[in-house]
Amino acid sequence: MCSNEYPWVCGVDEAGRGPLAGPVFAACVILDPASPIDGLADSKTLTEGKRNSLTLAIKAYSIAWAIGFASVREIDRLNILQASLLAMKRAIGKLPVTPARVLVDGNHSPRLKFPVTTIVRGDSLVPEISAASILAKTARDAEMMALHRRFPRYGFDQHKGYSTEQHLAALKIHGVSIVHRRSFAPVRELMANEKDAES
């Protein structure tokens, strides 16, 4: 990271804590006050098309942005909270500039060498965090589409790994894949039931 003399504020958010499959992603964004971006909001309130168009604007007009993730294996080894914080730390570590302050959505933050403030519902309240939520969501959705091409039987293109009826039905039919989170209760219980059936 390069040091700088500007009081740049970096927003950080994650995407994908709840799904049964796929990595958890995080993004960080330093917005440029001279180039405001209209329409920033919590990514969950935006359509896919709006998220995609805002992603292009964020990448084009922000001072800096970066994306990180933690793998399914790391999620199962660390737990989803710690894996989310790891993804955030990785994203921040990729920034080409040093922020003066980091604003993190929620009430947990990674350990960093900069001042950090957690903000509950920050993705709805703070433009930098809104922008980060959008980048994290679109990056994770793109990864789930790539996983769908590898594992089409699970329908990741439809539910992005979340615990829908379609996904649970596919798990019961096809079993657990290498991209499923084995520490998550529905997956863990399915594996236990399969083991009981074999014994």
From Swiss-Prot:
Residue sites binding a divalent metal cation per the record: 13-14, 105
One GO term (biological process): mismatch repair
Catalytic activity of the protein: Endonucleolytic cleavage to 5'-phosphomonoester
GO CC entries: cytoplasm; ribonuclease H2 complex
Superkingdom of this protein's organism: Bacteria
SUPFAM superfamilies xref list: Ribonuclease H-like
Pfam family, one: RNase_HII
Enzymatic class: hydrolase
Localization, UniProt: Cytoplasm
Any GO molecular function: RNA binding
Disulfide bond sites: none
Catalytic activity, EC: 3.1.26.4
Keyword line: Cytoplasm, Endonuclease, Hydrolase, Manganese, Metal-binding, Nuclease
Span of domain RNase H type-2: 7-196
Cofactor note (record): Manganese or magnesium. Binds 1 divalent metal ion per monomer in the absence of substrate. May bind a second metal ion after substrate binding.
Cofactor section: Mn(2+); Mg(2+)
Family, similarity comment: Belongs to the RNase HII family.
Function description: Endonuclease that specifically degrades the RNA of RNA-DNA hybrids.
Protein name in the entry: Ribonuclease HII
